[in-house]
Curated annotation (Swiss-Prot):
Gene Ontology cellular-component annotations: host cell cytoplasm; virion component
Entry keyword annotation includes Phosphoprotein: no
Superkingdom of origin: Viruses
Family the entry assigns: Belongs to the chordopoxvirinae A15 family.
InterPro entries from the UniProt entry: A15 (IPR008445)
Protein name: Core protein A15 homolog
Known partners and oligomeric status: Part of a complex composed of A30, G7, F10 kinase, A15, D2, D3, and J1.
Record's function text: Late protein which is a part of a large complex required for early virion morphogenesis. This complex participates in the formation of virosomes and the incorporation of virosomal contents into nascent immature virions. A15 is required for the stability and kinase activity of F10.
Lineage, highest ranks first: Viruses, Varidnaviria, Bamfordvirae, Nucleocytoviricota, Pokkesviricetes
Localization per record: Host cytoplasm; Virion
Main localization of the protein described in the UniProt heading: host cell
Pfam family, one: Chordopox_A15
UniProtKB keywords: Host cytoplasm, Late protein, Virion
């Protein structure tokens, strides 16, 4: 799924201890989602989401986000990424599936 510049993204972490927050993506700068994740807009249509501890999350289709082990590329977890509302740009909600 293409995420436009200045889009608002809601990330719901797996643990309840981390509060979900909104973040704005712009200028290809990394944006801290929580202590573990950062959003990095790429030059392509997709936005790459990187995990600090040797795990990467990235878009591989228009509707799904994959949490992947970078060493063997095994899919660890799949997320459903859906457009939800429009508010100052496109608003997306990341659901754990």
């Amino acid at each position: 799924m293409y995420i436009e510049n200045n889009s608002l993204v809601l990330i719901i972490p797996e643990t309840n201890s981390i509060t979900p927050q909104l973040f704005t993506i712009h200028d290809n700068k990394p944006i801290c989602v929580c202590s573990r994740y950062s959003l990095i807009p790429s030059k392509k249509e997709n936005v790459q989401i990187s995990y600090i501890d040797n795990i990467h999350m990235y878009f591989r289709s228009f509707k799904n986000l994959y949490l992947v082990n970078p060493r063997n590329h095994d899919i660890i977890k799949v997320f459903n990424f859906l457009k939800n509302y429009k508010w100052g740009g496109n608003f997306y909600l990341l659901f754990n599936v």
